[in-house]
């Protein structure tokens, strides 16, 4: 596949995969505090793993983009779940399997706190992806 849309502020990339036969996942509704959820991903470069999560809160957070530039504000979920490298970019699902967010980070202070963009925050990128066809640059590589 190739990256056809990239948003460094939201830390989202859309990858076009020609001839992919899998159906798109359905979109769900906004989650509230204490709602159960599911994180799906490939933590630590391993096989697909699905882990339980619970919404701690839905917050408007200000932080850095992927290049370390400050001042990025995003609608996110704070989650009680173990998020590992390899979960980032994976879906946050409701208990019916519908996408309600996109996992993007874990806490540096608490092994059992992760973060996901809300569907509302990811929506502009997802909507623009429908018309995206040409490969785009993802910018310079970063370490860490």
Residue positions per predicted region:
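Conserved active-site neighborhood of the chymotrypsin/trypsin-like protease fold
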Residues: 1-49, 133, 137
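Active-site region of chymotrypsin-like
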Residues: 13, 17-22, 50-139
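Short, solvent-exposed mixed-charge patches
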Residues: 141-144
